[in-house]
């Protein structure tokens, strides 16, 4: 019974145990099903993530995983163990339990990550790792690779798989930028873009897992090799980079930070684009433009700096700058601070290679295509892939880049071995780069095995700072509308920040003064560049003491205001000035709104607040002082940099203003010069010069209204009332001038004639002296020249005065009609001019400019043969024989005609009378007068007559009219006074051309009646004897004498006539002067019916014409022919226009300009013609 009872009890216990075991098994099955379901879900997630990462190879991975799972299930043997458990005893149950535990251990050992159920390595749909909370236990941080636009990049190793990858640590505060970068990395699946493995949060930072490129960046390769790349290497790198850019641009993504530091290369020589921290995903795919100012200054496109809308063509510009960087190891403008470089990029021409001749044309063209300021002209990425510089390279990337990669790897390994902290374990630090090197990190979690990461990063920063001038701004700048990272925000400047924007740099090496690691400082980009250029922050006490006086002076005064005062910067700097510096040491640059005057007051107040807070926090006092000193030092550097920028801008502005001012001054000066250029003299004035200069005569006009009237060069005659000044021709050197004084105003209204004739050395019986220079001229002192006495002026008749006045009155009236009549155009070139031919040694000084101008003109012989014939009445007169050759000078020396009548008071005029009446009428014919007398008159109320070195004669009263001599059977002699002055009248040619025309009516003498035009009477036969009122003998001057057998002048001048006329009365020895015929036995030159006859002086170089001396005079025809004497100066012929002319005879110049002589002689080789009467008055 006891045994049964025992057996029953045992059986009942075993049943209970079985029930319990069954219950446990059921529970275990439920758990297993749940785990399987969870595992399937996780496996699907893994498969999907692997499909995204791996791509087309995900199908094979799925099959392999399925096979591995089946094998694991077979090894577990869960179903058989369960069946055995149902029919086994307690021992069997214990065996099952043991086996079950062993199976669980086998599961954990055999199924590797990420396929086990322990969730060792897992990522979700957002590529977030969910397997473990502490990524430090999964990854081993090896070294720091570099810093990006928002964080630091490390080289890491996955502990379970030894897979090498790159981890980018970014502060979680920058959530917007992180989301942008992650979203872009998720979408980018290209061979030339770094792969994205996922992300996970570690402390206050976010870790982004990316593909690792063993050869690092192109920038690292340039620094390691210390040499630039070859054109083949550049071609391969650019080709692959353009493929990556094309993929991004197709996805409507702008990288915005293309540079050598962001182009990576792996061991297989595959180029990959990295660092999408500032990349932009354009929402508007149609427009495809952005406007945010981001990027690295030296690589920024001009449209980004100008804050204009831009598209993906900005990456093409950056790629062109990168090509220059690879070819020359540095980008353009790398030696300049970033702010100055950003000012120069939009304003300077596009950058090129510094030595383009050292590189091929294809590379220069590629850079030129990329770096075009107009974005529309830049080619796209797909177009650049067809550029000859990229197409001509046939080599594979491995062949070209593999040697470079191996060299870089060797040098990097060697550099690691030589580093001092290579084998020493560094102190525990966090793998972030948020604190400066000398700042302690309180309350920071410690990575177990990842120690010394920050020290390595700091050492790397030091090496980077030493290799390049960090003012080249290799860091990426971001212009933001607001800071967003300031915790206090007490000194927010309002809405003006958005308009101007603040250029900031995400510098992970600085934290705020309170020492809290979660508050990230944002400082201006150029301050960060200056900070890097100056090395580490000043930590020594001596340097702090040196900076303290600077800091105090900056706090007491406005730094920007001092800059404005020193450089006189425009007031608009307030709109661009510094707004404030908040308590987080964030320097905001932009418009400060209404707080412009309080910009730096806020800065000083904030510094004071910081100092108060530091006094309360003893642990952080040193840190705040260091930061304050750092800021003050940086502000001082900013001041210097702003001064340099301002000076450069002011230099450019001043140079531009100077060039504009020079252009304006040149324009004004040219206008003044053009306005002051003397107008070209008209034809009448030139004829005046030609006539006077060829004859080498001296004109002595009287200035009637002004003593300082300008010379001919300064005022050319433009009206009939203007008077021209005649300059003289002198031999070299010129003699001392004879200066005659001006008349007093009381005598200016009286017309005065000054007659000067050539005389022999014998004294004249006249007691009247020559005019003496008594009153001074305005320009020079007076001086006289001793000359022989000549007949007095008192013996001269008033007809001479009247004729001279009339000649002056009619001058420019004829000048105004020069271009009216073609038949009279040649005759109009001869002005009436009364000139003197004194000795060349005593002639007054005259300017040489007109002499050179008019004496060098070639003759115009065409006027000779084209002159119109005289009236028909005189055309039938036989020509006068002449044996003298044609003189080009005399043919040139012609003055403008004065169309005045030669008959007055119903009687024929003598040579002097015809001269007196020659200018009373404009359109009547006049006589040609050639005398040795200089006659100058002044009109009443007319334009003043001025001549350089003018001689001023005495005024004479008007004499009575000359009576007619009716007793002469052959040829009526001129009146006695005219006889007396006949030889002196020979110099009286061309008076009117000497002085510009005056008023016709106002200048006429009261005693001079109007000249009536009438036909002159026929001439009687020539007279045999000539008497003169003066006893001075007449010496033969030249062999040019008239033939006694030719009493008439030929109707027109021809070459034959001139040659015949050149033989008239050579070497006349008669010593008496006759006013009736004027020959006096002297050689006579005939001039045919032109308005005026100039005195012709034969120069010393001209040959003397030989002939016979004839003692009896010739009776000349009224139509006398001009005989031209040889001269050294060119001349022009003259045309007849009047029926009468006055013959001229050569006379010699004398020194006395005021006396009258009745004889003509030859002195030396100078010969002057003397005028003779051409007809006798008819009874």
Curated annotation (Swiss-Prot):
Cellular compartments per GO CC: cytoplasm
Coiled coil start-end: 12-53, 621-668
E.C. number(s) listed in UniProt: 2.7.11.1
Cofactor: Mg(2+)
Superkingdom of the organism of origin: Eukaryota
Official protein name in the record: Serine/threonine-protein kinase pakG
Family matches, as SMART domains: PBD (SM00285), S_TKc (SM00220)
Pfam families cross-referenced by the UniProt entry: Pkinase
Ranges of Pro residues composition bias in the record: 762-776, 954-963
């Amino acid at each position: 019974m006891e045994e049964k009872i025992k057996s029953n009890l045992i059986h009942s216990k075993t049943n209970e145990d079985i029930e319990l075991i069954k219950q446990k098994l059921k529970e275990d099955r439920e758990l297993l099903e749940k785990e399987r379901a969870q595992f399937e879900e996780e496996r699907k997630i893994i498969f999907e993530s692997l499909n995204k990462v791996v791509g087309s190879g995900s199908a094979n991975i799925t099959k392999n995983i399925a096979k591995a799972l089946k094998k694991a299930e077979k090894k577990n043997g869960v179903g058989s163990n369960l069946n055995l458990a149902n029919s086994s005893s307690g021992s069997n149950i214990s065996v099952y339990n043991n086996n079950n535990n062993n199976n669980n251990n086998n599961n954990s050992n055999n199924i590797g990550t990420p396929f086990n159920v322990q969730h060792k390595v897992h990522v979700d749909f957002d590529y977030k790792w969910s397997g473990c909370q502490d990524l430090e236990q999964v990854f081993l941080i090896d070294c720091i690779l570099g810093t990006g636009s928002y964080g630091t990049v490390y080289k890491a190793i996955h502990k379970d798989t030894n897979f090498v990858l790159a981890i980018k640590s970014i502060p979680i505060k920058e959530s917007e930028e992180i989301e942008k970068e992650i979203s872009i990395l998720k979408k980018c699946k290209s061979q030339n873009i770094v792969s994205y493995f996922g992300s996970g949060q570690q402390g206050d930072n976010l870790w982004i897992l990316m593909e690792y490129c063993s050869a690092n960046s192109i920038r690292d390769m340039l620094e390691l090799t210390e040499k630039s790349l070859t054109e083949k290497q550049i071609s391969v790198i650019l080709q692959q980079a353009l493929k990556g850019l094309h993929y991004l641009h197709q996805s409507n993504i702008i990288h915005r930070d293309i540079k050598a530091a962001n182009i990576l290369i792996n061991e297989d020589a595959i180029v990959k684009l990295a660092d999408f921290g500032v990349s932009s995903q354009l929402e508007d795919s149609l427009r495809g433009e952005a406007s945010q100012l981001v990027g690295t200054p030296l690589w920024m496109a001009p449209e980004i700096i100008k804050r204009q809308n831009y598209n993906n063509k900005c990456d093409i510009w950056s790629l062109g700058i990168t090509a220059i960087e690879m070819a020359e190891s540095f980008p353009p403008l790398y030696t300049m601070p970033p702010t100055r470089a950003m000012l120069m990029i939009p304003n300077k021409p596009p950058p090129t290679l510094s030595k383009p001749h050292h590189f091929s044309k294809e590379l220069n063209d590629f850079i030129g295509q990329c770096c075009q300021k107009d974005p529309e002209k830049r080619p796209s990425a797909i177009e650049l892939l067809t550029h000859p510089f990229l197409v001509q390279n046939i080599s594979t990337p491995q062949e070209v880049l593999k040697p470079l990669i191996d060299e870089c790897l060797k040098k990097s390994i060697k550099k690691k071995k030589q580093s001092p902290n290579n084998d020493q374990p560094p102190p525990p630090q966090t793998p972030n780069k948020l604190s400066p090197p000398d700042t302690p990190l309180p309350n920071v979690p410690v990575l177990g095995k990842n120690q010394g990461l920050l020290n390595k990063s700091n050492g790397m920063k030091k090496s980077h700072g030493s290799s390049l001038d960090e003012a080249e701004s290799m860091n990426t700048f971001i212009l933001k509308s607001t800071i967003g990272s300031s915790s206090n925000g007490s000194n927010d400047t309002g809405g003006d920040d958005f308009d101007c924007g603040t250029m900031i740099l995400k510098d992970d090496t600085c934290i705020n003064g309170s020492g809290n690691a979660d508050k990230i400082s944002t400082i201006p980009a150029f301050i960060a560049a200056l900070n890097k250029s100056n090395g580490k922050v000043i930590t020594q006490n001596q340097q702090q003491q040196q900076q303290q006086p600077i800091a105090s002076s900056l706090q007491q005064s406005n730094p920007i205001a001092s800059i404005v005062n020193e450089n006189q910067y425009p007031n608009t700097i307030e709109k661009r000035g510094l707004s404030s510096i908040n308590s987080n040491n964030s320097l905001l640059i932009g418009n400060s709104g209404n707080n412009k005057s309080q910009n730096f007051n806020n800065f000083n107040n904030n510094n004071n607040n910081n100092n108060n807070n530091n006094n309360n926090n003893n642990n952080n006092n040193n840190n705040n002082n260091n930061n304050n000193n750092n800021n003050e030092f940086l502000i001082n550097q900013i001041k210097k940099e702003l001064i340099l920028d301002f000076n450069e801008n002011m230099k450019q502005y001043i140079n531009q203003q100077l060039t504009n001012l020079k252009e304006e001054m040149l324009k004004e000066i040219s206008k003044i010069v053009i306005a002051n250029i003397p107008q070209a003299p008209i034809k009448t004035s030139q004829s005046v010069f030609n006539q006077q200069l060829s004859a080498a005569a001296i004109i002595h006009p009287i200035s009637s209204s002004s003593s300082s009237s300008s010379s001919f060069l300064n005022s050319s005659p433009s009206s009939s009332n203007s008077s021209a000044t005649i300059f003289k021709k002198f031999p070299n050197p010129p003699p001392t001038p004879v200066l005659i004084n001006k008349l007093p105003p009381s005598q200016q209204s009286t017309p005065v004639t000054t007659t000067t004739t050539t005389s022999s050395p014998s004294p004249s019986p006249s007691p009247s002296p020559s005019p003496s220079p008594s009153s001074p001229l305005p320009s020079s002192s007076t001086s006289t020249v001793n000359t022989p006495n000549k007949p007095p002026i008192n013996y001269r008749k008033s007809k001479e005065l009247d004729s001279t006045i009339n000649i002056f009155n009619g001058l420019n009236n004829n000048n105004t009609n020069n271009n009216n009549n073609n038949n009279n155009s040649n005759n109009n070139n001869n002005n009436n001019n009364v000139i003197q031919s004194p000795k060349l040694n005593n002639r007054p000084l005259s300017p040489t400019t007109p002499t050179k101008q008019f004496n060098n003109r070639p003759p115009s012989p065409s006027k000779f043969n084209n002159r119109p014939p005289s009236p028909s009445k005189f055309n039938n007169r036989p020509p006068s024989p002449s044996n003298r050759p044609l003189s080009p000078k005399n043919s040139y020396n012609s003055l403008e005609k004065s169309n005045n009548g030669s008959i007055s008071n119903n009687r024929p005029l003598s040579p002097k009378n015809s001269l007196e009446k020659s200018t009373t009428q404009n359109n009547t014919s006049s006589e040609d007068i050639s005398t040795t007398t200089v006659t100058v008159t002044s009109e009443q109320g007319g334009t003043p007559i001025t001549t350089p070195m003018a001689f001023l004669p005495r005024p004479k009263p008007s004499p009575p009219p000359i009576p007619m001599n009716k007793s002469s059977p052959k040829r009526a002699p001129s009146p006695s006074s005219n006889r007396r002055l006949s030889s002196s009248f020979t110099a009286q040619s061309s008076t009117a051309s000497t002085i510009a025309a005056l008023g016709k009516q106002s200048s006429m003498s009261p005693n001079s009646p109007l000249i009536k035009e009438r036909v002159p009477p026929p001439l009687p036969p020539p007279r045999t004897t000539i008497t003169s009122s003066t006893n001075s003998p007449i010496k033969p001057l030249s062999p040019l004498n008239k033939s006694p057998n030719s009493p008439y002048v030929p109707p027109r001048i021809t070459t034959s006539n001139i040659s015949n006329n050149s033989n008239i009365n050579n070497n006349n020895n008669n010593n008496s002067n006759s006013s009736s015929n004027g020959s006096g036995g002297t050689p006579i030159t005939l001039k045919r019916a032109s308005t005026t006859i100039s005195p012709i002086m034969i120069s010393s170089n001209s040959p003397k014409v030989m002939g016979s001396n004839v003692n009896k005079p010739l009776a000349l025809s009224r139509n006398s022919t001009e005989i031209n004497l040889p001269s050294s100066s060119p001349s022009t012929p003259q045309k007849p226009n009047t029926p009468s002319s006055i013959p001229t005879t050569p006379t010699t110049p004398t020194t006395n300009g005021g006396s009258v002589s009745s004889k003509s002689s030859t002195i030396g080789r100078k010969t002057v013609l003397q005028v003779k009467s051409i007809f006798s008055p008819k009874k």
